[in-house]
Amino acid sequence: MKSQTQAPLVVEGKLSDSERMKKESNFLRGTISDDLQNGLTGGFEGDNFLLIRFHGMYQQDDRDIRAERAQQLLEPRHAMMLRCRLPGGVITPKQWLSIDKFASENTLYGSIRITNRQTFQFHGILKGHVKPAHQMLASTGLDALATANDVNRNVLCTSNPEQSSLHQEAYEWAKKLSEHLLPRTHAYAEIWLDKEKVATTDEEPILGETYLPRKFKTSVVIPPYNDVDLHANDMNFIAIAENGHLVGFNVLVGGGLAMTHGDKKTFPRLASEFGYIPIDKTLAVAEAIVTTQRDWGNRTERKNAKTKYTLERVGIETFKQEVERRSGVMFDMIRPYQFTHRGDQIGWLKGVDNKWYLTLFIESGRLIDKPNAPLKTGVAEIAKVHLGDFRLTANQNLIVAGVPEAQKEQIEAIARQYGLINDEVTPLRKHAMACVSFPTCPLAMAEAERFLPAFTDTLDNIMAKYGVSDEHIVVRVTGCPNGCGRAMLAEVGLVGKAPDRYNLHLGGNRMGTRIPRMYRENISSQEIIEILDTLIGQWAISRELNEGFGDFLIRTDVIKPVVNSAIDFYEVQEVI
C-alpha cells in the first residue's frame, strides 16, 4: 500500500453533518424517547433517524409496496431492522427460543436473519414493538448496543469446532474486545430499559463525545481458517498458539470493502500487517488503534472516513508508530501464519473435547418457515433439547455446538425432519453469499438475497455441464457498493447498480486474500451467466491441480490481479 507520510494527520475543513448530529445528541439520546410517543408516524424523524443506529437499528420500509403506498398518499410502511450484539456468535438455546418467539409474534416477516457479522437481526419491527424488542433481549442477557453506526461493531471470532479449546480462548478475547470498546453512555439503558437517569455526566474515554468518524469492524482469527474474512475488517487479531494455547496475536489494520460507484477516491482495501503482540497487550493495542482512528480519521467526508483511508493518507508506518506511542507496546515481527480454508465445514465434526458439532447450511442466513422446509421451527425444536450452545458463523450458517455422543442421533433427526440438512447442496452453493438487499434495505440498487438461489441453480448446472460439480467457486452478490455481501473478497463478485444490472468482478481467490477486479460494468444477469459459462468451461479443461477459479483467471491473463487497490483497483481491464 502507499505510504504517504507528508499528509496532515487531521483533515481540516467543514465537518460532515453526522458530526453535528453526534455532538448535539447528548451522548446518543437525541429525542428518541419523545419520538417513541409520536403515533402520527411509523418512523423516527430528524436526527433520530440516524441516532437509532447506535442503538442497533436501521429504519427501513418495504420497497415492494412503496410506490403503491405513495399512490394512496400514505407514508412508506416504516419498520425497524434490529441487530443484536453477539461477539463471536455464541448464543444459548434458551436465548434462541426467546428471539424465535419474538420473531414469530412481533415482526412483519416472521424470520431471523443470520448475518455475515456473526449475529442475527430481525426485519420488520413496527415502532410500537421496538422497545419490547430491546427489553426482550435484555431479559435474556443480550443487547443491541453499538451494532451499527460510528462505533466498534459486533466482534467476529473464528467458529472452528475442531479446535474447541483454542476457540474458547479466542472467543473470550472477542468478548473482552467488544466490552472494552463499547460506548459508555447510559442512553441505551435509559431509553430502552427504563433505567433511571444517572446524575453523573456521561463520558466516552475511548470513543469520544462524537464517537468514531465511521463504522469500525474487528475480528479475532484462528488460522488456518479465514472464515471471518479478516480483510473486511478495520482491526484484526490473528491468533498465535503454542502448545494449543494462545500466546499472542498478529495485528492487521485497515481492511474494508465499501466503495461508491463513480468515486475513484473510494476503494476496497486489504488489511496491513502491523506486527505481533503478546496476549496481555491486546486491549492496550486495540484501544490505541481505535483512538488513533478516532483522532485522525476524516470527519469532513464520510466516504473517506474509514480506517483504510486514514492509513493511505498518513502512511502505514506513521499510523503504526502512533499506536505504539499510545499503547506503550512495540510491535514485534509478524509470526508465521497461513490460511487454507474460508468456508464452513458443513455437517458433523468431532472436537478435541470429544463432543460433536453440526454445522447447518442456511442459505443467505435466512431462517423462515418455507413450504416443505420449516427451517425456523426446526432450529427452535433443536433448541428445546440441545444441551450445548449455538454458534452463528460469518458465512451465515449455524453450528449446533457441543453435542454429546448420546444426543447426536436425535439432533440429526430433528434437523432432517425440518429441512435443515440437505445432502444435495453443492459445494458452490455452500460457499455463495448475498446481502439482504430488496425489499427492506434502503440502499439496495439490485437484488441479492432473492436473486442468489436461482443464480446458483444456473451456475450449478454450468458446473455439472463441465464436470466440476465437486469443486467450488466463491460467488458473492451484494446489492450495492457498500459491500455487505463481501463481494470484494470473492472469486466472482457481483455489485448491484440497478435492477438486474451488476458490475462483474473476477480474480479474487478462495482464501479471501486478493481483491477481484471489475471485468464488466453494468451488465445483466444473463450476460454474467454467459461470461461465466465460457470461463468455467475454460477452467474445467485447462486448470492446474487444485487451482481455484480466480487463480486460473489471473494465470491465464483473463484478468489482471489487484496488487495495490489504492493505486490499481480502477485500472481498466482490456476486453479479451
From Swiss-Prot:
Signal sequence segment: none
PROSITE patterns referenced in this protein's UniProt entry, alphabetically: NIR_SIR
Residues reported in the UniProt entry to bind [4Fe-4S] cluster: C435, C441, C480, C484
GO CC annotation terms, alphabetical: sulfite reductase complex (NADPH)
InterPro entries for the chain: CysI, NiRdtase/SiRdtase_haem-b_fer, Nit/Sulf_reduc_fer-like_dom_sf, NO2/SO3_Rdtase_4Fe4S_dom, NO2/SO3_Rdtase_4Fe4S_prot, NO2/SO3_Rdtase_4Fe4S_sf, NO2/SO3_Rdtase_FeS/sirohaem_BS
Reactions catalysed: hydrogen sulfide + 3 NADP(+) + 3 H2O = sulfite + 3 NADPH + 4 H(+)
Residues annotated for siroheme binding in this entry: C484
Cofactor(s) required, per the database record: siroheme; [4Fe-4S] cluster
Pathway linked to the protein: Sulfur metabolism; hydrogen sulfide biosynthesis; hydrogen sulfide from sulfite (NADPH route): step 1/1
Cofactor note: Binds 1 siroheme per subunit. Binds 1 [4Fe-4S] cluster per subunit.
GO molecular function: 4 iron, 4 sulfur cluster binding; heme binding; metal ion binding; NADP binding; sulfite reductase (ferredoxin) activity; sulfite reductase (NADPH) activity
UniProt entry keywords in alphabetical sequence: 4Fe-4S, Amino-acid biosynthesis, Cysteine biosynthesis, Heme, Iron, Iron-sulfur, Metal-binding, NADP, Oxidoreductase
Pfam families: NIR_SIR (PF01077), NIR_SIR_ferr (PF03460)
Enzyme Commission designation: 1.8.1.2
One of the GO biological process terms: sulfate assimilation
Quaternary structure (record): Alpha(8)-beta(8). The alpha component is a flavoprotein, the beta component is a hemoprotein.
Listed PANTHER family: SULFITE REDUCTASE [NADPH] SUBUNIT BETA (PTHR11493:SF47), SULFITE REDUCTASE [NADPH] SUBUNIT BETA-RELATED (PTHR11493)
Function: Component of the sulfite reductase complex that catalyzes the 6-electron reduction of sulfite to sulfide. This is one of several activities required for the biosynthesis of L-cysteine from sulfate.
UniProt record similarity statement: Belongs to the nitrite and sulfite reductase 4Fe-4S domain family.
Name used for this protein in its record: Sulfite reductase [NADPH] hemoprotein beta-component
Organism: Proteus mirabilis (strain HI4320)
Gene name for this UniProt entry: cysI
